Curated annotation (Swiss-Prot):
Originating organism: Cavia porcellus
Cysteine pairings via disulfide bonds: 20-26, 107-118, 254-278, 302-313, 316-321, 449-465
Biological role stated in the UniProt entry: Plays an important role in fat metabolism. It preferentially splits the esters of long-chain fatty acids at positions 1 and 3, producing mainly 2-monoacylglycerol and free fatty acids, and shows considerably higher activity against insoluble emulsified substrates than against soluble ones.
GO molecular function, one term: triacylglycerol lipase activity
EC number, as in UniProt: 3.1.1.3
Positions glycosylated per UniProt: 351, 398, 425
The entry's keywords: Calcium, Disulfide bond, Glycoprotein, Hydrolase, Lipid degradation, Lipid metabolism, Metal-binding, Secreted, Signal
Name of the gene this protein is made from: PNLIP
Name the UniProt record assigns to this protein: Pancreatic triacylglycerol lipase
Length: 465
């Protein structure tokens, strides 16, 4: 897959002019679709019969075996499609197919939390070609999705506002095309690492943008430039809410050695895909995990990932942060303005969710050189020990750090403190924490106190003050 990405960016496509198709209208290779610095290659989308877009319906009633539906009332009525439910389309990207495991896995995760029509859009006939051609074919894919949405509205009185399109890579821009063709009436579009080549910094008509739906949210996971870093995703903000997990460039767990990635737990094919495009694929894996972890992907408003990593963007500005992924639409300020940027950290493997806490420690006892660690205990769970500070430990000094826990502890009940000496000290000094303050991402503060001190490697439990 990696080789196809690289080669197809540099191979010429055949110039066309304009082509028209029944039902879908006309397509042009004039500017801005081609002949620009961002899209230098001329080319037209293929005939719909060649792309062969198929709609594969999964529902709570048929979670394991899809039903193929078309823009035909009798076909839809004989299926398990329900007009009183939301409909979520999933559109794959370059080289992929609608029957790939991750699309069905996303549907099955949805069925755990809601009753929904989940439609996997298969366009392998147009995705398994040169990238330059596939980037044109997504216009037809988007047009086909829009045609079905318009059909559902006109024939079954099904509102576009109940539609959510989830697109990965090129599928994000196909979703944008569907949104443009339905005049922004679609309820929501989620872009999962929208493809960069031929789309970044193009006019809005060409790519995904906030006007394509009532709400557009985007997850960026592979934003390095395609040349020379082989980053496949956009760094440009293109939604109402744009999330940059781990900075949006390099994802934890994507730097394993070649053998460990190819011999993946999910099989050789999935491992090979991860080796070729691990960062790019993380976007849909984060989304899938977010479905069953509604509070585990809080994004923090910040100027940059550097500021976020420097602990300058905590807690949530209004007491509530948007959740990256499935529940992004629950954020009250989701459409107050375009291009709102949010940052967060994730784990290096599933479950990717993390909960961020600020821990401030006021030291007591003797002056030594060492490092201190704190663990949290709450009514929902406990964390491991996290290092808060390393250096000169002076009584009365306050040190703070922010941690990303793989456990949501809930309401805190106690904390435990431990310290380690960096050098051998025969005087057996004692150090403690007179106060430890823990702040959750929602701004709630928990204070814990102790008058005790302990020797190195001895746990000290602090209770609420």
């Amino acid at each position: 897959m990696l080789l196809l990405w690289i080669l197809s960016l540099f191979l010429e496509t055949v110039a066309g002019g304009e082509v028209c198709f029944d039902r879908l209208g006309c397509f042009s290779d004039n500017k801005p679709w081609a002949g620009t610095s961002e899209r230098p290659r001329k080319g037209l989308p293929w005939d719909p019969s060649a792309i062969n877009v198929r709609f594969l319906l999964y529902t709570n009633e048929n979670p394991n075996n899809y039903q193929r539906i078309t823009a035909d009332s009798s076909v839809i009525r004989s299926s398990d499609f329900k007009t009183d439910r939301k409909t979520r389309f999933i559109i794959h990207g370059f080289i992929d197919k609608g029957e790939e495991n991750w699309l069905a896995d996303l549907c099955k995760a949805l069925f755990q939390v809601e009753s929904v029509n989940c439609i996997c859009v298969d366009w392998r006939g147009g995705s398994r070609t040169l990238y330059s051609q596939a980037s044109q074919n997504i216009q037809v894919v988007g047009a086909e999705v829009a045609y079905l949405i318009n059909f559902l509205q006109s024939q079954l009185d099904y509102p576009p506002s109940s539609v959510h399109i989830i697109g990965h890579s090129l599928g994000s821009h196909a979703a944008g095309e569907a949104g443009r063709r339905t005049n922004g009436a679609i309820g929501r579009i989620t872009g999962l690492d929208p493809a960069e080549p031929y789309f970044q910094y193009t006019p809005e008509i060409v790519r995904l943008d906030p006007s394509d739906a009532q709400f557009v949210d985007v997850i960026h996971t592979d934003g390095n430039p395609i040349i020379p870093n082989l980053g496949f995703g956009m760094s440009q903000t293109v939604g109402h809410l744009d999330f940059f997990p781990n900075g949006g460039l390099q994802m934890p767990g994507c730097q394993k050695n070649i053998l460990s990635q190819i011999v993946d737990i999910d099989g050789i094919w999935e491992g090979t895909r991860d080796f070729a495009a691990c960062n790019h694929l993380r976007s849909y894996k984060y989304y899938i995990d977010s479905i069953t972890n509604p509070k585990g992907f809080a994004g923090f408003s910040c100027d940059s990932y550097s500021s976020f990593s420097s602990n300058k963007c905590f807690p949530c500005a209004t007491g509530e942060c948007p959740q990256m992924g499935h529940y992004a639409d629950k954020f009250p300020g989701k459409t107050k303005e375009n291009f709102q940027n949010f940052y967060l950290n994730t784990g290096d493997k599933s479950n990717f969710s993390r909960w961020r806490y600020r821990i401030a420690v006021t030291l007591s006892g003797q002056k030594v050189t060492g490092h201190v660690l704190v663990s949290l205990f709450g009514d929902a769970g406990n964390t491991k020990q996290y290092e808060i500070y390393r250096g000169s430990l002076k009584p009365g000094n306050n040190h703070s750090n922010e941690i990303d826990s793989d456990v949501d502890v809930g309401d805190l009940q106690k904390v435990k403190f431990i310290w380690y000496n960096n050098v051998i000290n025969i005087t057996l000094p004692k150090v403690g924490a007179s106060r430890i303050t823990v702040t959750r991402s929602d701004g709630r503060v928990f204070d814990f106190c102790s008058q005790d001190t302990v020797r190195e490697e001895v746990l000290l439990t602090l209770q609420p003050c």
